[in-house]
């Protein structure tokens, strides 16, 4: 679209492929006209080039190898921050004395990781792809350092939030770099390789978290990010060069900032905080009908309405662009990913609690018992990526994966005190296989049906859905866990003070309540079953949402919205 064209919906000049007949003065006049109208240039047309990289621009050989390696390292550490904490949480609750803030250890990271996805996606549109990725990595490293030195729970939560902000930029930028570095037909293979880094972090996370928590300190769960992230930064600095299709928009800084939609991001953050706090207080420190809990829930609804109105008002500048969200190739896989990822993260955070509290294993032992799930996840990620690359089949794989995951999580729900090894090994393998085979397919579908200028934005939307699913699901699961446990303890161990139980770390319940341990374990198990039930429901709903995803093969649709 040439610069002199007009968007009929906005009646504003669009910044598209440069028209050589347009003078520099004309360009300046158009920019000034936009500024006087109080609107920034519509972001979806704001590219120097709407084309994917030319064939000779794709890196090859050693350069491609190192670029993919760097993105795998970056993916490894931002994913490790999601998987390593689950095993470390019982030890963290011991040091910071309580279960009341457990949901924040995961949700603070998911909140900023998800909330800033679209803004970071736009940052890659308006600023250098390479520079923005490196700055995001630096922010992530700062957050990890804060987590490592945190003197209390609040400092740890703050560090997690900062790390999530950096992780948002790294995730969007990493997959955008892969998209611009690989030909469309080979893209599923490389995203599968990056997915294997996620799987590797899933394998290493519980083991590393358990080893550090047992033998050194849980703080090393965060220190480990520093050298790995530094290596990834050096590789990107040397080997990656932004292609012509990824040139940033030439627009005034004010317009770039306006298009980041920081108001929308702030509303989303407030929305998530209200939800988490309501679930944290409800039934634990406050009754569900208390003014504080009701106020938070009312605030959640009010902010949600305000966010919808604000996003509609901003139009093309919004964090959530209506033009893109109307496409079935984006909203269907995004919704699928919200529920699918939410279900997985519940298992990721609560299986270690099951093993360490119910089975009385050490953190290392808990990590070892998680291996059936995480090893399956790692191996199957590569196989799934290769299959999709070879066949182009996407939606059927999503449905089959979600169906298998539903069966697997349903079987995990049947676990109880003293469940034999054969069941907790086999059920984890089944669930993991179901979760991994479709994990990256929503990303493949969104990218294969996006124009070059929309690549980073649609990538961000998938990550937004994934991480918000994690934030909401982990918070809901924690609320269900604690409330169910407190209700159950009144009958299984009536002499135990419920508030004392909440204030006791998951690995200390036997030492703290030796005379009532059987009743405490029954209460813990009831709470864990409540979390597993939520996991089953979410992945089951994801399976239904998969039916709405377009059934076209990915081959032949890359680079230009094949279906709407």
Curated annotation (Swiss-Prot):
List the Pfam families hit by this protein, alphabetically: MFS_1
Which family does the similarity line name?
A: Belongs to the major facilitator superfamily.
Broad class of where this protein is predominantly found: membrane
Keyword list (alphabetical) reads:
Glycoprotein, Membrane, Transmembrane, Transmembrane helix, Transport
Signal peptide (residue range): none
Renumbered to this chain, region (Disordered) spans 1-52
Give a Gene Ontology cellular component term annotated to this protein.
Answer: plasma membrane
> Which residue windows does the record flag with biased composition (Basic and acidic residues)?
1-10
Q: Which residues are glycosylated?
A: 37, 289
Role, per record: MFS-type transporter; part of the gene cluster that mediates the biosynthesis of gregatin A, a fungal polyketide featuring an alkylated furanone core.
Q: Report the InterPro entries cross-referenced here.
A: MFS, MFS_dom, MFS_trans_sf
State the source organism's domain of life.
Eukaryota
Question: This chain belongs to which protein, by name?
Answer: MFS-type transporter grgE
Per UniProt, subcellular location reads as: Membrane
């Amino acid at each position: 679209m040439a610069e002199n064209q007009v968007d009929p919906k906005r009646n504003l000049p669009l910044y598209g492929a440069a028209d050589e007949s347009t003078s520099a003065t004309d360009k300046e006049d158009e920019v000034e006209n936009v500024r006087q109208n109080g609107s920034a240039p519509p972001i979806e047309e704001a590219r120097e080039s709407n084309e994917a990289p030319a064939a000779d621009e794709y890196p090859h050989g050693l350069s491609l190898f190192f670029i993919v390696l760097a993105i795998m390292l970056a993916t490894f550490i931002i994913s490790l921050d999601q998987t390593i904490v689950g095993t470390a949480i019982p030890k963290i609750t011991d040091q910071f004395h309580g279960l009341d803030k457990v949901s924040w250890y995961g949700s603070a990271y998911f909140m900023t990781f998800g909330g800033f996805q679209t803004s970071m996606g736009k940052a890659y549109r308006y600023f250098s792809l390479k520079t923005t990725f490196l700055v995001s990595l630096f922010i992530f490293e700062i957050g990890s350092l804060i987590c490592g030195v945190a003197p209390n729970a609040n400092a740890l939560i703050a560090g997690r939030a900062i790390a999530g902000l950096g992780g948002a930029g790294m995730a969007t930028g990493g997959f955008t770099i892969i998209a611009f570095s690989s030909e469309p037909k080979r893209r599923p293979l490389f995203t599968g390789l990056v997915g294997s880094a996620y799987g590797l972090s899933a394998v290493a996370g519980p083991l590393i978290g358990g080893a550090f928590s047992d033998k050194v300190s849980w703080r090393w769960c965060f220190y480990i990010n520093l050298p790995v992230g530094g290596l990834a930064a050096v590789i990107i600095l040397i080997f990656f060069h932004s292609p012509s299709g990824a040139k940033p928009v030439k627009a005034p800084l004010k317009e770039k900032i306006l298009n980041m939609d920081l108001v929308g991001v702030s509303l989303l953050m407030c929305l998530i905080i209200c939800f988490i706090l309501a679930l944290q207080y409800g039934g634990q420190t406050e009754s569900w009908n208390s003014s504080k809990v009701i106020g938070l829930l009312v605030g959640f609804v009010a902010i949600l309405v305000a966010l919808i109105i604000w996003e509609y008002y901003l139009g093309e500048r919004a964090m959530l662009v209506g033009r893109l969200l109307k496409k079935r190739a984006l909203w269907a896989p995004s919704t699928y990913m919200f529920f699918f990822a939410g279900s997985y993260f519940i298992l990721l955070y609560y299986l270690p609690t099951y093993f360490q509290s119910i089975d009385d294993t050490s953190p290392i032992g808990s990590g070892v018992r998680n291996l059936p799930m995480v090893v399956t996840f790692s191996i199957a990620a590569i196989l799934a990526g290769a299959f999709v690359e070879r066949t182009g089949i996407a939606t059927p794989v999503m449905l089959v994966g979600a169906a298998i995951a539903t069966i697997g999580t349903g079987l995990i729900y049947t676990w109880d005190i003293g469940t034999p090894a054969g069941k907790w090994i086999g059920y984890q393998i089944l669930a993991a296989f179901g979760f991994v085979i479709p994990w990256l397919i929503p990303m493949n579908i969104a990218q294969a049906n996006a124009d070059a200028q929309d690549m980073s934005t649609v990538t961000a939307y998938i990550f937004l859905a994934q991480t918000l699913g994690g934030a909401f699901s982990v918070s809901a699961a924690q609320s269900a866990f604690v409330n169910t446990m407190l209700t159950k303890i009144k009958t299984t161990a009536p002499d135990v003070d419920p508030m004392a139980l909440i204030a006791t770390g998951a690995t200390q319940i036997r030492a703290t309540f030796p005379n009532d341990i059987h009743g405490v374990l029954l209460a813990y198990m009831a709470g864990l079953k409540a979390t597993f039930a939520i996991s089953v429901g979410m992945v089951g709903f994801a399976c239904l949402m998969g039916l709405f995803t377009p059934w076209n093969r990915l081959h032949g649709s890359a680079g230009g919205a094949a279906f709407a």
